[in-house]
Swiss-Prot record:
Pfam family, one: DeoC
Enzyme nomenclature, EC number: 4.1.2.4
Function, as annotated: Catalyzes a reversible aldol reaction between acetaldehyde and D-glyceraldehyde 3-phosphate to generate 2-deoxy-D-ribose 5-phosphate.
The protein's name: Deoxyribose-phosphate aldolase
Origin species: Lactobacillus johnsonii (strain CNCM I-12250 / La1 / NCC 533)
Keywords: Cytoplasm, Lyase, Schiff base
Active site: 94 (proton donor/acceptor), 158 (schiff-base intermediate with acetaldehyde), 187 (proton donor/acceptor)
Chemical reaction(s) catalysed: 2-deoxy-D-ribose 5-phosphate = D-glyceraldehyde 3-phosphate + acetaldehyde
Family membership noted in the UniProt record: Belongs to the DeoC/FbaB aldolase family. DeoC type 1 subfamily.
Gene that encodes the chain: deoC
Pathway assigned to this chain's UniProt record: Carbohydrate degradation; 2-deoxy-D-ribose 1-phosphate degradation; D-glyceraldehyde 3-phosphate and acetaldehyde from 2-deoxy-alpha-D-ribose 1-phosphate: step 2/2
Amino acid sequence: MKYTIDDFARLIDHTNLHADASNEDMKKLCDEAKKYHFKMVAINQVQSKFCSEQLKNTDIDTGAAIAFPLGQQTIESKVFDTEDAIKNGANEIDYVINITELKNKNYAYIKEEMKQMVNICHKYHVPCKVIFENCYLTKEEIKKLAEIAKEIKPDFIKTSTGFGPSGAKVEDVKLMKSIVGDNVKVKAAGGIRNSDDFLAMVRAGADRIGCSAGVKIIEALKQRMQDDNVTTIEINR
């Protein structure tokens, strides 16, 4: 598949999830998203209203992070926070699974949590992304989660929050994609800071990239295409 600069930009969830982010920081994030035509801004739930107002009358989404970054909230709390975020303007949701219950092998809990989160998102026609936080998981746990997702069908499964000890890995993206196939998309996030890493994740099967380095990445890709005198880059997946 051949990608233009805009195609690449539309893969990016432009991210600022820092605890000390100000309204000025959020405005900058949204302004950059508009300038580069990113797909979404990824922000903490409490900033849903502010960012959705900044992005009004654009095709750029406001993505609220739920139970971020630990996932240690009840299902009821996650569902409440999701609906609250949506009512305040969020039109994409990324939530962190309850890793404790996964470690307990309480797969019924994980399945019920995912089902309720997907249902509340889809009630409002909002995409739901499930954050695995792979740095804490074994390969078998990643596989099991992906199998549950294949059954429940969230819109995306996601590698990481970016706040754990490590972020996205190419082998994890490949593993996740190999299980869900075309039923669910994969989002790579965490530690993707340059154009080589970005392209590697797309080649591995990621359909969305969460990163705070989106401007730097797009500018590097523009320069690469200019140097090669091309308007597209072909990616074989």
